[in-house]
Amino acid sequence: MRPTVLAAALAVALSTTVFSAQAQAQDTNSELAELKAQLAALQAKVVELEERTDAQSDVNVDTAGQLDKLNTGTTKVDTKGGIKVTSADGKFEAQVGGRIHFDAYAFDRDLVDTTGTTEFRRARLTLSGKAFGWDYKMEQDFSAGTNLDGLRDLFIAKSAFGGKVTIGHFKPYRSMEELTSSNEILMMERPFASATGLFSGRQFQQGVGYLRAGENYTAGFTAFNMRGASSSRTEGVGAAGRVTFAPINTDNSTLHFGGWASHENLNKGSGNISASANYAGRRGPSQTIATVTGDSGDTSNAFGLEAAGSFGPLFFQGEFANATFEQPLLADQDIQTWYLQGSWLLNGGHKAYKSGTGVFASPKVADKGLWELTARYDHIENKDVQDREASSWILGMNYYVNANMRVMFNYTKGENEFTGDETGQYAVRTQFAF
């Protein structure tokens, strides 16, 4: 009996164990199948995401390409410091600029009756740019008139022979301060070694010029007609040339030397040319120093030497010029003029050097503005006519409000040896250029 029961029990136990093992195996297979299905689903999602990423990348690349095409195919407009329009390919430009110089002055009278008042010293509108490889510039000064009297620069220019050729109405290459922009001159008026004195009334001439420049040198030559834009036709001709060299030219220090020469030959139709001195500021008394009559066919020859430097906030500049004015009957007359001027930027700043033209620019203005203390002594003399000389002392202050605006104050004390006059002038200028 007992063996039978024992055998039955063993049979039941074995069958239960086998059944349990089979059940567990089935569960394991089911779990493995489920995991495989989940893994396959995940792989499918990864593939889908990769395809989407590739597609989006293609879209991004295509979009960037389209934006590049859009940027290169759009005309650019810049309104900083004026209005400038540039074509998409950069081959065409047009820029509108201008300057407003508004003056007020009063005289400390001596022997000459003078009138203090206000006036627009300059009111210019400028159009410049480039087209088909040529540069162009047209400038009208409405303070001098709306016709040819107010015409200033009017020329075309093209890069050639390692430099630039200019054709039209522009300044001959002579005198450092004459070639400095009126927006950047140190005092309200230029010294006697310029069209303010030695080349009175001959600031812009019609002709052709060539200028070549490097990092520390310039060399320029001009051949011109003695006719200005508003003067009568003439067969008189002239020539001028200037060279400069800056042995020191760094971001904070510049030392400049230069020299120039000018020849003016009067001929049929030429007007008189003269050297004169407004020794007590603009609209003050004037003294003629020498004259060459146009009908005589005589000449005027001049040369000048330049030295200037800018070291940190300190600046100096000087020129010496000698001119010979031929006379039809009497001996020739020699004119000598020289000036020395300087400045100190009281709260920092530096007058940078324009290596392309061999002159100095205004300092770059920070948010707080810049104060500049200025001084100049200026002298001109006819060495062959007794007491035909004049001089002036100028003390001033410039305040650079920003890159476009400057306020100037000048006190000028003049002296005329010929008449004994010692008129003085107080002058203020508000200047805006764009």
Sequence positions of predicted segments:
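Gram-negative bacterial Sec-dependent N-terminal signal peptides
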Residues: 1-24
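N-terminal periplasmic/intermembrane-space "pro-region" immediately following the signal or transit peptide
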Residues: 7, 21-99, 346, 351-357
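Acidic-residue sensor for enzyme active/binding pockets
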Residues: 31-34, 50, 139, 189, ...
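Short Gly/Pro-enriched turn/cap motifs at secondary-structure boundaries
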Residues: 73, 115-116, 197-201, 294-298, ...
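Outer membrane beta-barrel
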Residues: 78-267, 339-365, 372-374, 378, ...
